[in-house]
Amino acid sequence: MLLLVDAGNTRIKWALVDRSAPEQTPGKWLQQGSVARAEAGTLIEAWRGFSIGRVMLSNVAGHELRGELERAVLHTLGTRPVALEWFASAAELGGVRNRYLNPTQLGADRFAAAIGAHALFPEGPLVVATCGTATTVDALSAGGEFIGGMILPGLGLMASSLAKNTAQLPQVALQSTLTQPFADNTDAAIVSGCLAAQAGAIERAVAAQMRTYPNLPIPCILAGGAADLIAPHLSIDYTRVDNLVLIGLHTVAIQHSPTC
């Protein structure tokens, strides 16, 4: 059994893959789950009883969580001699070439998501928007190169920063049911502005790719916990994909092992 783990700033997602299956398809797994970052210790129980023979993890949430994950995995493995494979960005991996000036500086989650998106849509240029604690909007070339991208505060972080750093603006509950861009009350105006900023960044990225590839379709892949809030405010076509980082990890695991 292959265990895949995506540890983000807010949640930890995981999936289990049957390594004995004759055909391996990225994103096809036996079981999956998700816990809040503070609940990392509960993963021991979630993974109990599975015969895990390989582990691949992505972690962007710091050394403390990495240690917690290591303890949880090692407790699950018991005496089985299984090495933990920590995914990290590289110059080329999983069929994607990394054009970052310093390829190792690219966040592991962004590179894994790009690999996952390319595995699902291998035929042309892409925009990959992952909407979480931070929103990242990245571009892939028609040849499968990670060109680069944008990083901006996520929807929740954007709204909370207004409440924290201004004297009279409140903390608002985020929702996507706004029907008009020009709100007639302060709470709705904050939500409208934050949603417009997120949607605008994504649409701007797609427009840039369209200028580069005027004769090709530009699929926009939308992922992350806040994607469903932002999606109704996009004026472009998009494809909603869950667990994009896990799909990227699975892609790498398949390509770098004869049995998985």
UniProtKB/Swiss-Prot annotation:
GO cellular component: cytoplasm
Alphabetical UniProt keywords: ATP-binding, Coenzyme A biosynthesis, Cytoplasm, Kinase, Nucleotide-binding, Potassium, Transferase
Protein name: Type III pantothenate kinase
Positions of the catalytic residues: D109
Main location: cytoplasm
Pathway assigned in UniProt: Cofactor biosynthesis; coenzyme A biosynthesis; CoA from (R)-pantothenate: step 1/5
Cofactor(s) essential for the protein: NH4(+); K(+)
GO molecular-function terms, A-Z: ATP binding; pantothenate kinase activity
Residues where ATP binds: D6, A7, G8, N9, T10, R11, I12, K13, T133
Catalytic reaction(s) noted: (R)-pantothenate + ATP = (R)-4'-phosphopantothenate + ADP + H(+)
Family: Belongs to the type III pantothenate kinase family.
Single GO BP term: coenzyme A biosynthetic process
Naturally occurring in which organism (per UniProt): Janthinobacterium sp. (strain Marseille)
UniProt EC number: 2.7.1.33
Subunit structure: Homodimer.
SUPFAM superfamilies in alphabetical order: Actin-like ATPase domain
Compartment(s): Cytoplasm
